[in-house]
Amino acid sequence: MGGIPFRSTGCNTCRRRKVKCDEAKPECNRCIKNGHVCTGYERKRVFIHKSSEVIDDGELKLARRPKSTSGKIPDRQLTRVEPGLPRLNINAEVRSQLLASFVGGFLPSSRHLQDGKESNILKTLPELCGNSPLLDRALLSLSSAFLAKQHKDDRLLGYSTKLYNNSMEIMHGKIKSGRGLGQDVLYTTVIFQLYELIHSSPPGFMAWIAHVQGSNAIINQCSVRKKETIAEKLFHRQLKFVTLCDAVGRRKAATLYEVLTTQQRLSQGSTELEPIDELTDLLAECSALIEHVDIFIEQLPACPNGDKNDGEKLLGSCLSLEGRLHQTCLRMQEKLGTPSTGLHDVPLREDMRAHLATSLFPDPFQFASLACAESHLIYWATLIILYPLVDELLDVLGYCRNDVTPSQSCATHPPTGEQRSLDLDVTTDFTALAEHYADEICRSVMYCTQSDMNTLGAQHLLAPLSQSAQFFQVHEVAQKYRWCQGVFVLLDSLGLGIAPLLKDMVWPQYRSARLRRSLSSTGKVS
């Protein structure tokens, strides 16, 4: 009888070269001596799931047929039973490997992280496994959906969809039970939001919105600890941001966001926040100003001689927010750095490179880290939303263009000879300034979509680029709008199935506000 087959324990390079390895770690001496790259001892893991195309004798089962009236056909015979979905081993080890493959394929390489490390919601997922059957199912559906899309595996995608629907049923049962909900339920709603970004369900964009609003509906039912864990902090940050996206789209104040911000500060025992948190807090203030300005403008036709003081206060609030945005950006740049224009030989896919190369915008930006890029994108997106409000208030209050000037913005890149000063017309026209910052977001696309950025960089682009595209569309900047549409189509190949649905997405409230402004000259206050 033969013994156990020999299995080499050497490094991957020596195994491939079929030579004896001295097994020194982390790199073997033989590879170093002979000038080879030692690829280490970690074996490549391959996940194999059975499909209906490969059925062995073990899947032949007895199936009882209805009794025949003639009695000639036996009522019991072997029947081939086709599995409707792949059978995937979901034991703890395989589940953790599947999740690790998803996280590794979604997050960027360490060179794009601040100081080689950054807190991210996905990094906390492995530690959450095994504590909640609901959350485990949601995480497995998310991981398998991403990997299925990456490898074009329809069977695995079908498995993911079934698991997703099963998780939804479990969650709805927990909510309807009337009992207190744990943090795992809140986390699951956020996981579902990520799932919709990767593999959008038939309702499309509105399925993502439904999960955002579902999170908002249950947050007060979920138990809150006195001191947040890192995972709780990152999940709450994600929930705050998507709540803001929904609120800005509906042109309503993000009321829940204020509760979350207060909870976070109380749990930290400090009012000091990270730069991205400060900027999203200011975006929340902007969402409230949108609603207040809309109400003020809409009341003008019924009351042409409306209270000018209310309009003046709103204008003052907008300009105050603008100044605080610039100051926050300056503090952020002290910590994270400023953009530069030295982006050369960026590793991009050819179809991506062909579309992004354009003369519509100045040179593309380079950032010190993805956190630096994300913070600037939120800063610019907030200004795109804010400046049209200022222009509209100036119109209805009867101000001339030069009566109010914007405050000094922070530099987009270090003050060198390359620094471009804005044209005089732009610095005295708030809507033109908004277009300038929409351009800045477009200049960031190449950095966020380079090959080793994986999917996270593209995810950070979704909301800001959507604001730019909406601005270009309603202000009829056709070429720039078509360029943004092309980017959204390409983002699908980076793992964001929702992106193509955003290429034609203009919130109805945003379009009606633009139409209202074109008619606002008839409703000036005196």
Give the positions of each predicted feature.
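C-terminal region signature
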Residues: 18, 80-92, 116-118, 215, ...
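Alpha-helical interaction elements in eukaryotic regulators
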Residues: 24-27, 135, 156, 160-163, ...
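Intrinsically disordered, low-complexity transactivation/modulatory regions
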Residues: 26, 35-37, 448, 492-496
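Central/C-terminal regulatory/activation regions of fungal transcription factors
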Residues: 107-111, 201-409, 428-439
